Structures are given as structure tokens and as C-alpha cells.
Amino acid sequence: MSLMCYNKGCGQRFDLEKNSDDACTYHPGVPVFHDALKGWSCCKRRTTDFSDFLSIAGCTKGPHNQEKPAEPVKPEVKSSLDKNDVKPKYDEFIIQAPKPLESIQRPSPDEPFSILQSKISPSLKQALEKLKLTEENAHEIKEEDSDEIKIGTSCKNGGCCKTFAGQASDDETCLYHAGVPIFHEGMKYWSCCKRKTSDFNTFLSQEGCTRGKHQWKKKDAGKKVVPCRFDWHQTGSQVIISIYAKNSVPELSLVEGNSTVLKIHIIFEGEKEFEKQISLWGVIDPSKSLVNMMATKIEIVLKKAEPMSWARLDLPPVAPPKEKEKEKDVDSEDECDDDED
């Protein structure tokens, strides 16, 4: 009878009588997720794609393990205080933002746009140099681009642990997860079947919920539009917007604007794209504004046209007239006409 191996990175079934000392290739370490990179603590290979992470070959050989690891016990948190006894540490104050000065005439948002001057920091130049493909990576990409599928190639479908063993593998039914992996508050599960667990090995060994064909090659998704965390602060003469996009590509990124509108287009980490258009709260001088591109973020330094404090970064859209008030006015006019008749 075949048994399931619970070594990390294996997930294969094995015969207990044929379990030799080097039958299993696995990871003795733990999974590491940091700054969008995924890998194992026992080896140095890192990737941003979850399917590639699951297909990273083990770095240690040993016998298969049939013992399922115990799930971690969550500590029970008790409190002796009632909710009503908890008081806020600080008094609450409501601060009203200053209103824009009425004397300033706002330029038209349809003014011509100009590209803001950009400066590339030494840290970004150094980071981009490190990210250049080595000869080994270039060879791997060339192999992936070829039509030939090599023996031992892992299926790229999520949750499938099968490898290519010949033409017969194409006729097999692939059991995989059509959704995406979700890690939230210590729980791990696939969005397509919602079977939650706190143990990473149990998550990896969950059988797929969808039947289909094996996917031996990674699909080319092209550039992916993603959100970026950003914030802003101001001085007496400048507004500084910080966009936290790592390793941006200067040749493919630009920021353009006029006196009241800013258009941001950034390509970072090779294949990620961030776009945003902001209708600014105040007025700027684009000719004296600039973009500082660094390894960990991008700073857009906007020169204020007037030395005044901005209540917020963006200008709220003008609210359209309420339709209900218009309907009431029409109804009142109709009632007056009826009374005259």
C-alpha cells in the first residue's frame, strides 16, 4: 500500500518496503516569504511566483516520512478586564483641515503636460546591476522558451505535484487548484475550495479540486498592473509623494503633469506596472518639480506655486446636483398649476 510522504517539498506517495535512505528529495528548512520573494530557509533560491516556489526541487536527500506533523497549538488569550472598563489612553480631538484660499485662481486641468525631470540614485543603479540575468539564469530561460519538455519538469498548475515522465504524462488527468493561495491570520488555503489549515505541509498536500490537463510550461502573463502603497507629506514650499515600488526601471517609467494634474506611470521589479492620475488639491510648478528614483521607493517632489498649506493631496470631485431636489421643485410647480385650475 502506498503512503503519503510528509517531508517538505516532496508530497509523493511511496512504498514502505522500498523506502531507501536516499529515496526522498526534500527541504529540511521552513518556507520563507519576505518582500514578495518566496523560498526555503535551507537553500538560497528565491522566486516571486508561487507556482515556481512549489516546484523548487529539494536540497536534501533522505528516506520518505509517513508521519504527519502535528498542527501548532494556538495560545489562548484571556483578559480579566471587561470591555466597559477599557478606557482610551488619549482624549479624542477633531481637527478640521484648512480650506483653500478663495483668492487663488485654479488653472484649467486641460493645460499641456510636461515630463518631470528625474534623478536616479546610486542605490537604484547598483540594485539594477545585481538584477541583470546571469549566464545560468539566461540558460534556464532559454530552456523554458524551447518547445521541448524535459523529463522531470514539474506541472505548473497550483497544487499538482506530478512531473513529466514522457508522452504518457500528457494523457493523465491533472488534479489542481484553479484559484490562488491565500495566507491570512495564520491560516492557509486556496481561494477555490476554502479548505483552511494552519500547517504549511497540510496545505501543500491538499488534493486539487479541479480536473484538467497538466501545464508543463509557465504561461506568459506579460506586465501586470498592481497597486502600490504610497503616502505624502509637505513643507512650506514642496509636496513630497513617496511611492513604495522597488527596483523601478527608469527607461520605462515617467511622471508627467501640469499645474493641477499629475500622471504617474512606473514599471518596477521587471514585470509590474503602477499607474495613477491625481487631480491635485493645490497648484504646482511642473518646471521646478522632479522625481527621485531610489532602490526602495520613488519620491515625487512637487514645487508649490503658492507657499500655502494643502489640506489633502487630491482634490475631491465636484458633487453633481441632487436629483431629488429637482424632482421636488417640479412637483411643487405641478401642484401650483392644479390649484390655479
Curated annotation (Swiss-Prot):
Quote the record's binding site residues for Zn(2+) 4: 177, 192-193, 209
Q: Where is the CS domain?
A: 225-314
The residues that the entry says bind Zn(2+) 2 are 27, 42-43, 59
Q: Where is this region: Disordered?
A: 61-81, 313-341
Where, by residue number, does Zn(2+) 1 bind?
A: 5, 10, 24, 64
Output the CDD domains linked to this UniProt entry. Answer: p23_melusin_like
User: Which ranges carry the CHORD domain?
Assistant: 5-64, 155-214
Comp. bias intervals (Acidic residues): 330-341
Can you cite a GO biological process for this protein?
regulation of centrosome duplication
Q: Residues that bind Zn(2+) 3, according to the entry?
A: 155, 160, 174, 214
> Which keywords, in A-to-Z order, does the entry hold?
Metal-binding, Repeat, Zinc
Gene Ontology molecular function = zinc ion binding
Which portions of the chain have biased composition (kind: Basic and acidic residues)? 64-81
Q: What does this protein do?
A: Regulates centrosome duplication.
Q: List, alphabetically, the PANTHER family matched.
A: CYSTEINE AND HISTIDINE-RICH DOMAIN-CONTAINING PROTEIN 1
**Descriptive protein name:** Cysteine and histidine-rich domain-containing protein 1
Q: Which gene encodes it?
A: chordc1
